[in-house]
Amino acid sequence: VSIKGLAHVAIQAKDYQATLAFYTEVLEFKVAHHWSLPAFKINEACMLLSPDQRTCIELFDDEAVIAAQGKKAKREEDVAHGALLHLAFYVDNARETYQKALAHGAKACIEPDQLSLGEPPLIVRNALVHSPNGEIIEFIEEVDWTRSAEG
C-alpha cells in the first residue's frame, strides 16, 4: 500500500456562500460536485477543484456535523489551533495573489517576501493572509524541493 497524495482538505465555513466565493473568485477553484446529507446535518457541501485539477477542498456549511480536530469555536477570539497550521497554494505570483485576496476580504498576515531557507539555500517567495472565513492561507511561488533531496 502506498500513499498517492493528499486527497483533500475539509473546511467548515462560517458563511458558506462568502467562503465559496473567495475560493472560486480569488483562487479560481471550480465546484466539481455539490451535495447535502441530512443524516450529518449537511445543508450544503461541495468539492472544489483547483485550476490544475490536482488539489481539492471539501467545503461544508456551518451546521454540518463533521469529524474535526478540537471543539468548534463559538467566537473568533476563541479559536485555538491544533496540528493544522495553514493551507499553502502554489501561485504564479505571490504578491499579485496576496493583493487580490486582500481586495476580496482577506486580512494581511505576512506581506509578500523572499526567504532563503537552509543550505544549500532555497529561495521561497510567499505571502500569507487570513481568509474571510478565518483559515490562514499561504501563497507560494514554485519551489524545487527535490533539489535538496538529491544532494
Stretches found by the model and what they are:
Residues 1-18, 40-42, 84-91, 140-151:
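N-terminal beta-strand motif that seeds the catalytic metal site of vicinal oxygen chelate
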Residues 1-2, 89, 98-151:
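Vicinal oxygen chelate
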Residues 5, 44, 53-55, 83-85, ...:
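Residues that flank catalytic or metal-binding motifs in active/ligand-binding sites
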Residues 12-57, 103, 120:
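Core segments of cupin and vicinal oxygen chelate
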Residues 47-49, 61, 90, 128-130:
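Short, well-ordered beta-strand micro-motif
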Residues 54, 65-66, 145:
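Active-site/binding-pocket entry motifs
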Residues 58-62, 68-87:
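Helix-adjacent hinge/juxtasegments
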